[in-house]
Amino acid sequence: NLNWDLWLGPAASSKYTSQLHPFNWRGWWDYGTGALGDMACHILDAPYKTLGLHYPTDVECSVGQVFEQAWSQNFVPKGCPASSIVTINFDKTEKNDSKIQLVWMDGGLRPSHPEAIPADDFLGEVNSTNGVLMIGEKGVISCGVYGLEPKLYRKGKETIVFKTPDRSNLDYNHHMEWINGIKAGYGSDEYKKITAPFEY
């Protein structure tokens, strides 16, 4: 059973609707933060860990519009944008000696297919709309959510497919990493493994 009033928390009181719970709450500012807040912690883990990213130097955002009919924009201020592009810039890190630009796209927006990746290869995981492209001077690394199915593409060279641990085991998934980090306590080795700690 769900205690609806408790679930609403500090948000304005409203009647229960299946259009909000159990899934779509993510797209409303009173309850969630849109696709970026919902999925970035799973998708951006790979570049954050691989490149040693910390806080950004600056962020720029552009959002898509929704039209109900010709030239009539549907603006819903309580709802997160239907699509967005967020450009996040970082200074060089201990793992990368040049500045890094990270571009987040959601709502069906996708980057151009890099030349180094064969046209029939998925960007990220097979049959998934989510993924990561890390584009460097010598090649491209692609992976899916949670860093799964990583591949290294280098122009004119054979694709390298990396093995990743099976994360279907309950002892080794993002839920348990988060719980173990909390149990071990702030500043512990387990806590430091969490790429998005709640230190703010």
Sequence positions of predicted segments:
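Glycine-rich, aromatic-lined ligand/substrate-binding cores of catalytic
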Residues: 3-189, 193, 197-198
